[in-house]
């Protein structure tokens, strides 16, 4: 049966995703940066409360995926902590200056990960040669690759997603970026066995008093009286479609 991974930005979202039928959670913070490593407090809360598999992201900052030695030191510490806390997997990705998989750094993280199932995230979509990268990640032993097919969204990337899914000899190819209730059927019809979605919405702040003219963001257009959260109805509806699809092909 196809699996649905939901990207969550905190414990509250993770609990909603679990309750709605998600098969697995990618745990991040800072959606405006595409997701960075959660704090220890969030990690502890989620590992204590959530029963389905949770894979935290190991990403020390926003921006590109070519990391300094200081960045890499933080990543090594984070993956060791996540392993020791008892998570079932983690999400990482490192490229070198030329846009290839940074094999030496990835090999070190894979060794530190121990039993963790490793997802190589959408750094894959920024690499120069996706088929070579697939071979390299297979040799490294990653469990899955999260990718949009090197396009702005996964629907546009369906041709490469199909090719990767046909060629893979190891990593599961998981479609992500712009996967929604309205287009999830296209990914299932393409034979993809894992789907990644934020399935989210903007929730209003509970604050009654709202100070005007002051912002904590460098982007003055950001509405700081909303926050991103998982939409329970959307997750449930996506799982319903996946269940119907599985029944129809069996």
UniProtKB/Swiss-Prot annotation:
The gene is cutC. The keyword Cytoplasm applies. Pfam families: CutC. This is PF03932 family protein CutC. Its main location: cytoplasm. The lineage of its organism: Bacteria, Pseudomonadati, Pseudomonadota, Gammaproteobacteria, Enterobacterales. It comes from Proteus mirabilis (strain HI4320). Keywords: Cytoplasm. It is found in: Cytoplasm. InterPro entries: CutC-like, CutC-like_dom_sf.
